[in-house]
């Protein structure tokens, strides 16, 4: 049997991230959450998301009753799984790095989009399951619109947030506020 493991949201600007574990043969699918707090300042610098990923993968494999003697894991190539790889090697777990596509990828990206829409309130029609620059700017613009209330959702441990994007977000927020005031007068 084969278990696929993938992530979503680990490189996105805001919100929680998610790990998905999927047993192909039975269709069993489970999710685990990496809190946005893990991606802030010291937690990020101390690689807390990578440590938590190991814990969550272990927990997910237990729930799926994983048997290392007759199952293989197809593991997403993402950096979030770097310490998971070490764990698999130490435990003699048979795994392959792979590009995860199909049902699991769709499900775990869907979990992220649901979180962004339903938990955080991102309403843009431009928000899709496809990661990349377009999604970054949808999320960035959402933060800018109400910066001081939404900054708490930012993965502020990311270096570029503190060296580039935070200042740009404040600047954009201030421009929007001035524009709103002009419209009222």
What label would you give each PLM region?
Residues 1-185:
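RNase H-like, Mg2+-dependent phosphodiesterase core
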């Amino acid at each position: 049997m084969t278990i696929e493991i993938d992530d979503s949201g680990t490189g996105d600007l805001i919100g929680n991230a998610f790990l998905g574990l999927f047993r192909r043969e039975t269709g069993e699918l489970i999710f685990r959450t990496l809190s946005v707090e893990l991606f802030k300042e010291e937690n990020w610098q101390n690689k807390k998301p990578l440590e938590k990923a190991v814990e969550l993968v272990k927990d997910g494999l237990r729930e799926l009753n994983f048997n290392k003697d007759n199952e293989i894991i197809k593991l997403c190539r993402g950096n979030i799984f770097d310490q998971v790889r070490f764990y698999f090697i130490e435990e003699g777990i048979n795994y392959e790095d792979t590009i995860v596509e199909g049902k699991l990828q769709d499900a775990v990206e869907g979990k992220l989009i649901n979180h962004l829409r339903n938990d955080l309130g991102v309403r843009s029609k431009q928000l899709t399951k496809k990661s990349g620059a377009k999604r970054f700017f949808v999320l960035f613009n959402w933060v800018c619109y109400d910066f001081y209330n939404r900054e708490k959702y930012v993965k502020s441990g990311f270096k570029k947030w503190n060296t580039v994007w935070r200042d740009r977000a404040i600047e954009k927020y201030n421009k929007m506020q001035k524009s709103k005031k002009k419209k009222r007068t």
